[in-house]
Amino acid sequence: TVQQNKSTQYGPAIWNPAPTCNFSSRSGTAISAITIHTIQGTYAGAISWSQNCASSVSYHYVVRSSDGQITQMVDEADKAWHVGSENPYTIGYEHEGYITDPSWYTQAMYEASADLSRDIVLSGYGIPALRTYYGPASTGTNVIGGCTKIKGHQHYPNQTHTDPGINWDWEKYYRLINNNPTITTLTSAAGAFYDTGGNGSNYSDDERKLWLFQPTNATSVTLNFTSFSTELNYDYLFIYDGNSIDAPLIGQYSGSTSPGTITSTGGAILVEFRSDCGTTAAGWAVNWTSIVPNTVPPTTSIANLNDWKTADWNVSFTDNAVTAVSEK
């Protein structure tokens, strides 16, 4: 039996340290970001490579594909060598697999990696979970601004590596790291709806909000946007055809192009808003309406003529749901 030492920094992880030849001091630089890597190899190979002084490579954590097992190799307080010029302020972890093969990115791996990120977010470094990248995956390098604190190797400046690449599901990862905020539910048949700044002020930075339009007994809901303005390509409104973020996505909107008029296929629409850490805008104004079937039961009144008839006669009744009807 091989004795495995447990990490004292992250309980679920195994502690298997890299040699001192492969990491160094942060020299006082504060930790402020997380780097997501794909090793282009196996879990065991990543551990072995970081323990080889000839590699001049290390990472704080390695995540296994099959079951999400994690090995810690460098203390978070130390500078691992994984993202070049951006090493001093980042914590890096490698994920087993290859960027061209999505089968390596298993649910177990996503969940284990996200749990690790959640732990680091709560460790006092000042890394907000909301600042996880959630945009489309891409090939090549794609530098993302400093507002985004949890992102891929390919998203940092001065890089040539392109991991985790086109097959990493950033939206999934964002949702695993971030709990859904409390939903504000609107049940009136119609009304006005504004961003958090109201009618006349901007929304705020670092927002994630959910609003559910679900009028009582409605068969459809319509949102009519009369104005719309968010920070283009940074602050987004998502509209879902249903009562959760797992419902079909109707659209994702940013900038000054209005969503226009949106109608649900059922009795609910969910609206989600996400803003980044800088630059706000006027937001939006919406009038919403809904179709609610008439649920008032019909009532009938019969006039008693007190007059016995031996021939054809007329009976008149009034239905609240329709016009008066006369029957013979």
What label would you give each PLM region?
Residues 1-84:
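N-terminal catalytic cores of peptidoglycan-degrading enzymes
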Residues 1-17, 23-27, 99-181:
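Basic/polar, cationic surfaces and motifs that engage anionic cell-wall
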Residues 32-34, 57-59, 91, 148, ...:
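Residue-level detector of short, conserved catalytic/binding motifs and their immediate flanks
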Residues 36-41, 63-66, 73-78, 94-98, ...:
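Active-site-proximal beta-strand/loop segments in catalytic clefts of secreted hydrolases
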Residues 43-47, 100-105, 159-162, 232-233, ...:
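Extracytoplasmic/secreted cell-surface and envelope-processing proteins
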Residues 84-95:
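Short coil-to-beta-strand
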Residues 181-293:
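Domain-level representation of secreted and single-pass membrane ectodomains enriched
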Residues 292-328:
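Low-complexity, disordered linker/stalk regions enriched in Pro/Thr/Ser/Gly
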